[in-house]
């Protein structure tokens, strides 16, 4: 049975308005989710325009088919159930060579967080899962119970940036020798045992960074985003734009670096002009990330860490 998606879209107007939508253009929503960005983008297209919407979660696609029904009836939407790391291949299969714009809303969606059985949340007791694609084989249970100490430390440091990574990895090792760690609550309690009292008093849940690290590992989120954003920039038509919303420093750092590499060039000294093959292919639309307004921050708590970066294709 399809579960309802209740998702408040973050930076809705900013993300789509910054794409400078062409009514007859071809656009991509790389992270369909609750379909908020897709719906607003479609409202700016003529019936000659088209949207390709990616999601690896069938539940998201099922719900979007209801929300976007008026546009589907006009033949303006194509859903692609796949990881966005396969963006270029899947669009080529659909006969698309160039796109006029693309948006990303990275990370886990509100409905995935809110569905207890998906195992994303440290606030709700559930089996350790955390798969965005429920057909995938690697789960949080596998990571927590079968990764060795060194691999746990690696992902906790790299993806969670938690200064207690070694102690938490050791405590997990000790706990699973007694019995497997099966639920989100069990894992959260183990993490709490390691954190000193002053850490537990800080704002935010003590397990947040470790849960983030495991989720990124299970879904290879940063690897997928890296590949996909580079493919997207390659596929953009001249003057096409890319909008990327991030929710934590690792995603934002990655996006900032990819945009920087595509929008700058190191020219050898002595060259009288820049050869075409050395010219940067992108330019930043906004030097600094765009942040949610005060009104949005008040209305949607999950928007607090959101940042939007936008770039434009200036050279093929």
From Swiss-Prot:
Catalyzed reactions per annotation: cytidine(1402) in 16S rRNA + S-adenosyl-L-methionine = N(4)-methylcytidine(1402) in 16S rRNA + S-adenosyl-L-homocysteine + H(+)
Entry-linked InterPro entries: RsmH (IPR002903), SAM-dep_MeTrfase_MraW_recog (IPR023397), SAM-dependent_MTases_sf (IPR029063)
Broad enzyme group: transferase
Pfam family, one: Methyltransf_5
Binding-site residues for S-adenosyl-L-methionine, renumbered to this chain: 35-37, 55, 84, 105, 112
Cellular compartments annotated: Cytoplasm
Listed GO biological process terms: rRNA base methylation
GO MF, any single term: rRNA (cytosine-N4-)-methyltransferase activity
This enzyme's EC code(s): 2.1.1.199
Family: Belongs to the methyltransferase superfamily. RsmH family.
Known function: Specifically methylates the N4 position of cytidine in position 1402 (C1402) of 16S rRNA.
Name of the protein described by the UniProt record: Ribosomal RNA small subunit methyltransferase H
Organism phylogeny: Bacteria, Bacillati, Bacillota, Bacilli, Lactobacillales
Gene that encodes it: rsmH
């Amino acid at each position: 049975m399809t579960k309802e998606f209740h998702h408040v879209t973050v930076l809705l107007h900013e993300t789509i308005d910054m794409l400078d939508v062409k009514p007859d253009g071809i656009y991509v929503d790389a992270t369909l989710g609750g379909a908020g960005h897709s719906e607003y983008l479609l409202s700016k297209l003529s019936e000659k325009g088209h949207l390709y919407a990616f999601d690896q979660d069938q539940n998201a696609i099922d719900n979007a088919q209801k929300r976007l029904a008026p546009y589907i009836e006009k033949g303006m939407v194509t859903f692609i159930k796949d990881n966005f790391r396969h963006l270029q291949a899947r669009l080529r299969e659909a006969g698309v060579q160039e796109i006029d714009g693309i948006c990303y809303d990275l990370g886990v969606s509100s409905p995935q967080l809110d569905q207890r059985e998906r195992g994303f949340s440290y606030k709700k007791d559930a089996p350790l899962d955390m798969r965005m694609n429920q057909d995938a084989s690697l789960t949080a249970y596998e990571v927590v119970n079968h990764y060795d100490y060194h691999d746990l430390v690696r992902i906790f440091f790299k993806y969670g940036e938690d200064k207690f990574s070694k102690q938490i990895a050791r405590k997990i090792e000790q706990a699973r020798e007694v019995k497997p760690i099966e639920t989100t609550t069990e894992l959260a309690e183990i993490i709490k045992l390691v954190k000193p009292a002053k850490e537990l008093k800080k704002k935010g849940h003590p397990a947040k960074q470790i849960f983030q690290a495991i989720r990124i590992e299970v879904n290879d989120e940063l690897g997928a985003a890296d590949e996909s954003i580079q493919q997207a920039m390659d596929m953009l038509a001249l003057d096409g734009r890319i909008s990327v919303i991030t929710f934590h420093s690792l995603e934002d750092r990655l996006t900032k670096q990819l945009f920087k590499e595509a929008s700058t060039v190191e020219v050898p000294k002595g060259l009288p002009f820049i050869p075409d093959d050395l010219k940067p292919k992108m330019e930043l639309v906004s030097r600094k990330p765009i942040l949610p307004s005060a009104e949005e921050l008040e209305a949607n708590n999950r928007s607090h860490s959101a940042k939007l970066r936008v770039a434009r294709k200036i050279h093929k």
